[in-house]
Amino acid sequence: MEINYELYLITDRRFLKGRQLKKVVEDAILGGVTIVQVREKDVSTREFYNIAKEVKEVTDYYKVPIIINDRLDIAQAIDASGVHLGQKDMHLNIAREILGKDKIIGISVGNVKEALEAQNNGADYLGIGTIFPTGSKKDVDAIIGIDGLSKIKDSISIPSVAIGGINKTNFKDVLKTGIEGISVISAILDEDDIKLAANNLLINK
């Protein structure tokens, strides 16, 4: 499966401001988002399932891949394109056994060692970060910056996206590293005009 990682949106209901998630995701896709990850940490399994199912209706319509954060059971239940796992989540090899070879598995990494391990274990792509300070992740151990991103990117051969504090003022510097895409939350979801916010993060608009 050929995946376009150029503009990777991660959901977060805290930024909805009363708006419908389906509408927000649709506007983001119309603005240029190429892949969507459903990431909702503080909800019940049933609620997460309902949220993911709702988002998948939109991503299916626009033929955009949908990734589920951490929850393999939800990914299987809605037949998502794949999952994204952190360093403390289920091991990649076990996730691959459960999901099979045709599903996408992404791994969060913050240094070269983690990146090479994930690549060697068969990750389809990496989420590299945290690049810049951000308010949406509370357990950030280290900000790696553009230099750290470049070192990791240069050490691997699989696709990767950068994450952490990326916005319309700095995304071009991030893309200069040769990374396949940028992953954002508030840079799109915290804006009033979702479609425009997404479009402002495209290098070739």
UniProtKB/Swiss-Prot annotation:
Its EC number is 2.5.1.3. GO terms for biological process: thiamine biosynthetic process; thiamine diphosphate biosynthetic process. CDD domains: TMP_TenI. Mg(2+) binds at D70, D89. Disulfide bonds: none annotated. Pathway: Cofactor biosynthesis; thiamine diphosphate biosynthesis; thiamine phosphate from 4-amino-2-methyl-5-diphosphomethylpyrimidine and 4-methyl-5-(2-phosphoethyl)-thiazole: step 1/1. This is Thiamine-phosphate synthase. The keyword Aminoacyl-tRNA synthetase does not apply. The lineage of its organism: Bacteria, Bacillati, Bacillota, Clostridia, Eubacteriales.
